[in-house]
Amino acid sequence: MTLLNPFFGEFGGMYVPQILIPALLQLEKAFVDAKDDPAFIAEFQTLLTEYAGRPTPLTLTRNLTKGTKTRLYLKREDLLHGGAHKTNQVLGQALLAKRMGKSEIIAETGAGQHGVATALACALLGLKCRVYMGAKDCERQKPNVFRMKLMGATVIPVHSGSSTLKDACNEALRDWAANYESAHYLLGTAAGPHPFPTIVREFQKMIGEEAKAQCFEKEERLPDAVIACVGGGSNAIGMFADFIDEPSVRLIGVEPGGHGIESGEHGAPLGHGSKGVFFGMHSYLMQDTQGQIQESYSVSAGLDFPSVGPQHAHLAAIGRAEYPSVTDKEALDAFQELAKSEGIIPALESSHALAHALKMARSEPEKEQVLIVNLSGRGDKDIFTVADIFEKEGTLS
């Protein structure tokens, strides 16, 4: 029997082998106890402020929306220690692991950002760390592989399946099933079996809480929309959580359109998938008519995931949030534009959200609106990927 509701409407649940149920229930109990323990909360807050660098700024863009009446703000998770929003919830889960008496951490990573965040938290808190990463992603994200190793983590390349994030997730779950007594599985996104979607949201929701307060301070009102990229969905749910009960604020989660939805090479299960069970949860996923998981695709390794967190599935189903998609090309254009106009190099993941915000601003230039984009990470990890693409296309002017 769970202590918290494992479902968001019809989505969520705990669809895992029986052997993992005790580990998930132990984790849920530890989380429920910890969130009501002032000492745990104080330690988490201290790490967020003194180690990670919170609160992060809300930056008004100066040049990007010239010619429009949009005021576009960036929530600067790229300035967080570790380079992305991932550090927030990793510190929370690592503290939980120590509280449960675990000595080892297992993690999966796509772009490598969650792996880096996990490695730094383990180094700080004295935990052993092993990270599963798709072999294809290891190639795409060599700087992050080196960072993880530098901080003492063991990086295990996964060659099965499509050699990407979904395969790394499967291997990490297998490892946890065999070693859950000594190890905690530090899941990197707001997906997977209960209680992970709830835990990750709670350890990421300061993004939206800060953004709301900062927006009131600067604009004396709520934003018209908050916009975030969606792979598994942790940075988006962290931004959305504090705005869900504010009906005047549009919640926009941007999925990766890859080479275009019509090409079939994308990662947009909310817009173009169907319901099913995957990775321990009931959600939307990319599957064929036989229920086989289809390969997702995105230029951004961190969005290359064939499903999505159950709370996003629920928000989509009830019409509270909208989930458009942005192609590789649109994201790459936004990546270059932010760098040239504001001197900020965003992660390719975050560039998807930025691209959609720019569409909103430019499609209605006379509309006075306040938009907040969650700039979920910085683009250092992506410069080699992008340089190769621009070189092939001859597009770096």
Swiss-Prot record:
This is Tryptophan synthase beta chain. The modification N6-(pyridoxal phosphate)lysine is found at K86. Pathway: Amino-acid biosynthesis; L-tryptophan biosynthesis; L-tryptophan from chorismate: step 5/5. Its cofactor is pyridoxal 5'-phosphate. The keyword Acetylation does not apply. HAMAP family: Trp_synth_beta. Tetramer of two alpha and two beta chains. The keyword Aminoacyl-tRNA synthetase does not apply. Its EC number is 4.2.1.20. GO terms for cellular component: cytoplasm. GO terms for molecular function: tryptophan synthase activity. Keywords: Amino-acid biosynthesis, Aromatic amino acid biosynthesis, Lyase, Pyridoxal phosphate, Tryptophan biosynthesis. Belongs to the TrpB family. Pfam families: PALP (PF00291). The beta subunit is responsible for the synthesis of L-tryptophan from indole and L-serine. It catalyses: (1S,2R)-1-C-(indol-3-yl)glycerol 3-phosphate + L-serine = D-glyceraldehyde 3-phosphate + L-tryptophan + H2O. It is an enzyme of class 4 (lyase). SUPFAM superfamilies: Tryptophan synthase beta subunit-like PLP-dependent enzymes.
